[in-house]
Amino acid sequence: MVHNDFTPNFKQTIQPLLDENGSNPSRITVYNLWRRFDEDGMDAPFALCDSRTVSEKELIPTDLFNYGKEEEKTETLADENGFTVEIYQSMNSDNHKWYFYPKMNRDEVVMFKTYDSNENPFMPTLHTPLMI
């Protein structure tokens, strides 16, 4: 599934946690790291889309239920079922420019931004593992 892990609504999602901790950050950013963990090759090579080639009209806000693992939950954000976060899925476009990482080794990592509260307009970094 081609997606970005968050939409511009992410700050609203975590606002109860910020309030609980008395935190009022001027900026929130979220970065993802993608790394291969298996020893003998990637069964799902990674693909990353240049955010400058993505149009807002191609994005589909989608609720992802039960987000977060048990040990990551807080009383403020989640119960035993996790919590709901809004992600972007994307329609396909010939305008998308993709970068592929088919032969990463365990010492390589790709870092990319998935949320920035100061970014206007919000530019999601679409990504997906390629199931081949």
Residue ranges of each PLM-predicted region?
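Non-heme Fe(II) oxygenase catalytic core, chiefly the N-lobe of the double-stranded beta-helix
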Residues: M1-I87, N95-H96
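Catalytic core of Fe(II)/2-oxoglutarate
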Residues: F83-I132
